[in-house]
């Protein structure tokens, strides 16, 4: 009985001490001692070790340093885990293999971490010196399992028709806690709108009804405080179309819905439209208020020389056998001889570069011809100089240019003829005593020809 009473007294004293410590924690840290932690919330993975770093500092002399760790859950009293005075550690025997501390470092190591270890961890530091200083901090610890890779399934698996069917996408995860789901399309988050809605946990996406704009790559991103994983890309099957039906050709000129084709050309027409699955195409020719199908498939070849009329009307029809929708476009083919006209237009339409090149060549050739003309016809300059002389100077020049001594007249001369009357009279007066064999035609020749005859005349006179 006495032993039971002693144990009861010991329990009451320990409980009283824990209550006092808890009250001190609520009061906060004391002046001169500061305890800090990097984060007030730490997320841990079940089965792995978790380290709770703690730092403290003080500016007064200390004889003893005491560190105490407590653990509490919601609506429960704090539980003693371990403590130390200086470098001596006193653990709770129940947790001596789970919690580790190496004083004077106040950090705590939890290994291994279990779901039962989730809660608040309180660290209290006491400094004994001239007085006692105390400070504490609280750290919240959460424990989770990592997320496993999710898988996405969609229904119906065969696909849905645009504006008619609906699609449901479901994200499934086999492992993980506190899961958060997010749906993405082509890498961007999907938000709620008139056709998109989610389940309460966001693990299901409904698209009602589906449209062509809903085509894309869908993924499910699942995360929790310790990890995140994204599913493989899935692309639901959506049937739509046809949209944007149009006809093009490899030759000819297209203006609106009219194709102009040169006579003798074989033109290949192509009919295309956006749809899934691909459309089936048919070509219809209209003539004399009647229509008849001439070909099936996306291509139609028209030989212009085989067309009886110069104008022909055609229709291209596109049909989607899944959506049940169809579309058609009409066009006209005009056959004309435009080959010569094209050549004439090409000849008339010179490019600016060709025009500049032609003008440049013309200027260069003109400058070269002008240079040659000035270089090899200098008589004009001499003529202008002689015509500007007075008559007396000219006669004086004639007087002293006789042939008294023909041998001294040999040399290199440059003469100019004068076709006017004054020039003829001057030349005739100068050349008359030369020789009887010189005719009137020689008088109108150059002075170089007269000089050529003078030596022969003088030689005859000497004989």
UniProtKB/Swiss-Prot annotation:
User: Any idea where this protein resides?
Assistant: Golgi apparatus membrane; Cytoplasm, Cytoskeleton, Spindle; Cytoplasm, Cytoskeleton, Microtubule organizing center, Centrosome; Midbody
The residues that carry sugar chains are: 86, 130, 166, 321
Instruction: Tell me which positions the record assigns to the signal sequence.
Output: 1-32
Which coarse location class applies to the principal site listed for this UniProt protein?
Golgi
Top-rank taxon, per record? Eukaryota
Bilayer-crossing residues are 353-373
One Pfam family, please name it.
Ig_3
Keyword terms, alphabetized? ADP-ribosylation, Cell cycle, Cell division, Cytoplasm, Cytoskeleton, Disulfide bond, Glycoprotein, Golgi apparatus, Immunoglobulin domain, Membrane, Mitosis, Repeat, Signal, Transmembrane, Transmembrane helix
Question: Which Gene Ontology biological process is one annotated for this entry?
Answer: centrosome cycle
UniProt key word Ribosomal protein: no
The record describes its membrane topology as:
Single-pass type I membrane protein
Q: Which residues lie on this side of the membrane: Cytoplasmic?
A: 374-463
Q: List the disulfide bonds.
A: 171-220, 271-316
Maturation and modification: Poly-ADP-ribosylated (PARsylated) by tankyrase TNKS during late G2 and prophase, leading to translocation to mitotic centrosomes. N-glycosylated.
| Gene Ontology, cellular component aspect | centrosome; Golgi apparatus; Golgi membrane; midbody; mitotic spindle; nucleoplasm; spindle
All copies of domain Ig-like C2-type, residue ranges? 150-234, 236-332
What does this protein's UniProt record list under function? Required during prometaphase for centrosome maturation. Following poly-ADP-ribosylation (PARsylation) by TNKS, translocates from the Golgi apparatus to mitotic centrosomes and plays a key role in the formation of robust microtubules for prompt movement of chromosomes: anchors AKAP9/CG-NAP, a scaffold protein of the gamma-tubulin ring complex and promotes centrosome maturation.
Q: What is this protein called?
A: HEPACAM family member 2
Q: Which organism's genome codes for this protein? A: Mus musculus
């Amino acid at each position: 009985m006495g032993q039971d009473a002693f144990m009861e007294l010991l329990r009451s004293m320990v409980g009283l001490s824990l209550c006092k410590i808890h009250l001190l924690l609520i009061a906060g840290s004391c002046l001169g001692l500061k305890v800090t932690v990097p984060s007030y919330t730490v997320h841990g993975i079940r089965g792995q070790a978790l380290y709770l770093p703690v730092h403290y500092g003080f500016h007064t002399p200390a004889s003893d340093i005491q560190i105490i760790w407590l653990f509490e859950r919601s609506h429960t009293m704090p539980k003693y885990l371990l403590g130390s005075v200086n470098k001596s550690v006193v653990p709770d025997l129940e947790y001596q293999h789970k919690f580790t501390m190496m004083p004077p470092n106040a950090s705590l190591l939890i290994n291994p971490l279990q779901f039962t270890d989730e809660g608040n961890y309180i660290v209290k530091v006491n400094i004994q010196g001239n007085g006692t200083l105390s400070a504490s901090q609280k750290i919240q610890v959460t424990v989770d399992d990592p997320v496993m890779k999710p898988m996405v399934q969609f229904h119906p698996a065969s696909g849905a028709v645009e504006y008619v069917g609906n699609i449901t996408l479901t994200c499934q995860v086999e492992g993980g806690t506190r899961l958060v789901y997010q749906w993405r399309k082509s890498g961007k988050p999907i938000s709620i709108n008139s056709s998109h809605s989610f389940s309460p946990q966001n693990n299901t996406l409904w698209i009602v009804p589906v449209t062509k704009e809903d085509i894309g790559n869908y993924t499910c991103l699942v995360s929790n405080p310790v990890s995140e994983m994204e599913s493989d890309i899935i692309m639901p099957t959506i049937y739509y179309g046809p949209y944007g039906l149009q006809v093009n050709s490899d030759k000819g000129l297209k203006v609106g819905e009219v194709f102009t084709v040169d006579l003798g050309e074989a033109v290949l027409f192509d009919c295309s439209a956006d749809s899934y699955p691909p459309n089936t195409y048919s070509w219809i020719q209209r003539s004399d208020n009647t229509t008849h199908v001439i070909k099936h498939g996306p291509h139609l070849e028209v030989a212009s020389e085989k067309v009886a009329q110069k104008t022909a009307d055609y229709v291209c029809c596109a049909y989607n056998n899944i959506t049940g929708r169809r579309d058609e476009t009409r066009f006209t083919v005009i056959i004309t001889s435009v080959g010569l006209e094209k050549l004439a237009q090409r000849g008339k339409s010179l490019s600016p570069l060709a025009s500049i090149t032609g003008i440049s060549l013309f200027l260069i050739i003109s400058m070269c011809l002008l240079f040659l003309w000035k270089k090899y016809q200098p008589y004009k300059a001499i003529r202008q100089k002689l015509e500007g002389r007075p008559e007396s100077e000219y006669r004086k020049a004639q007087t002293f240019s006789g042939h008294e001594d023909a041998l001294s007249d040999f040399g290199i001369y440059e003469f100019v003829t004068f076709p006017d009357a004054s020039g003829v009279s001057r030349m005739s007066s100068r050349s008359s005593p030369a020789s009887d064999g010189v005719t009137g035609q020689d008088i109108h020749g150059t002075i170089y020809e007269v000089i050529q005859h003078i030596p022969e005349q003088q030689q005859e006179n000497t004989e």
